[in-house]
Amino acid sequence: MIFSSDNYSPVPQQVLDALAEANKGYQPSYGEDSQMTKVRHLIQKVFEAPEAAVYLVATGTAANSLALSTLCEPWQTIFCSPVSHIHEDECNAPEFFSGAKLTLVGNSDKINPKELKKSIQAEESRGVHGP
């Protein structure tokens, strides 16, 4: 198994078969096609959230970045570990999509609450010029 990227390996045969099947005939666009309707209903059922909006994206980077963009305003900060996936593997996509700033906390894989508090205070001390 190769875990270096979510789009590194070839597509499994069942995915190719599903794409070929989905390519038969015509479907409305912009998320109104029959496949998207099935996906939306399944996710709403699984999460017991009948009003949930569902958007499919092409990569994990897009999913992670868009999810982070819903959690903060463009002038805010996303605190993360220096070895976090969003820092090491997503390039600047989270900052691009959210407008927020990634701020590294500590120097290990787990964020220490004391280090986080110190980082928050450092950002707050910048006043209107900080996130």
Show where each model-derived region lies.
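Extreme N-terminal starter segment of soluble prokaryotic enzymes
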Residues: 1-2
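Structured catalytic cores of enzymes that bind and process phosphorylated ligands/cofactors
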Residues: 39-42, 48-54, 77-79, 109, ...
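Short polar catalytic/cofactor-binding loops
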Residues: 7-11
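PLP-dependent aminotransferase-class I/II
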Residues: 97-131
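Conserved core of the PLP fold type I
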Residues: 51-72, 104-110
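Conserved N-terminal alpha-helix of the aminotransferase class I/II PLP-enzyme fold
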Residues: 12-60, 82-87, 93
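Conserved PLP-anchoring active-site segment centered on the Schiff-base-forming lysine
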Residues: 70-88, 117
